[in-house]
């Protein structure tokens, strides 16, 4: 058994800890892990002890390293013993982690007892070699009409999720987890990066209620935690996802909420380490930091990791260096809008603002592409006509424009869909719509043969057959 290398704490400045290793041949490497025992007082005035992990960030002097703490540093004292882990912090992987919540160091934080993992993998792993990566473009069917038709996601792709509070990001995320688990037998990893603890707790409770928790791993580093935690928690989640991809051969979904907070934490860490900031105060290594995470998200010949990342845009400035560095990696953008949520159209995905670079005939086929572009054309024309309708009314429109408005309103409603995870709230059974059914249904709507059916028959249904059935129930002549 290798000898344990030990050092001692010589300086603590907030989340930065300097550790001295005297008489060692080789200092711990950058990104390697250290651990020590933190003694502190809890809310009730009782002393407690816990393991504090740290990550080596700099070598300063001959025997000294500067480390970033992966937890609070109150209670640390100069001279206390620090143990070198011999490599990066190791994270539990495998089916044993499903249904559990972990912190950045891979420790369970859900009070459900220890995790009996058979394998532990390092937090930092290199992206797959180019020869291991899959060059095949394979569309990931989500069963959600508006996504599959207008902004297709590919296996191993990266999707940016944009939307304010209360427009349905969480429910959309849960439905994707549900559909991947139920219809593709895949697993999901949810990574909370610098978001509200309350939201993390709510998501856990909602997942328990909707029955998707057994197929999910949750890794949290919330906004009340030190910057080191928020900066590294995405890597912890990716390590767990990589096991399912590389060993189990799974198509894994990873949700990162919020990727901007990862960049923000990196800026804090960079400042603490004394690096000169670059544009707008961000770290000089901004693109490298983002790239390290994004390059690990890819398809291999064994399986895939598909990422859906919530992106906060500071002050709605799309040219800010942080979102700009993230956009460079995205294949698709999903924009949720309050305007549609207020109309009761869920998922409230804006069909005109949302994009995918894989909505092209060479990837999705001619038929899919033509149907999607015609749907977008009609919705765009409807958007242009809305101002005229608001001022002059429908009567002033030409017959052709009236037909477009009527069809667009039906298409808009048809893009809504009842979700499985929302059944208990809506009372409507969830619908999973296969891609070929989505294309066929919209193709038939575009011909105009269903323009005579009431608008509400198109609302919250699956395929065109469901529309016809609903219209019959409403007493309409089909």
From Swiss-Prot:
Transmembrane segments: none annotated. It is found in: Cell inner membrane. It catalyses: ATP + H2O + 4 H(+)(in) = ADP + phosphate + 5 H(+)(out). Keywords: ATP synthesis, ATP-binding, Cell inner membrane, Cell membrane, CF(1), Hydrogen ion transport, Ion transport, Membrane, Nucleotide-binding, Translocase, Transport. Its main location: membrane. Produces ATP from ADP in the presence of a proton gradient across the membrane. The catalytic sites are hosted primarily by the beta subunits. HAMAP family: ATP_synth_beta_bact. Belongs to the ATPase alpha/beta chains family. This is ATP synthase subunit beta.
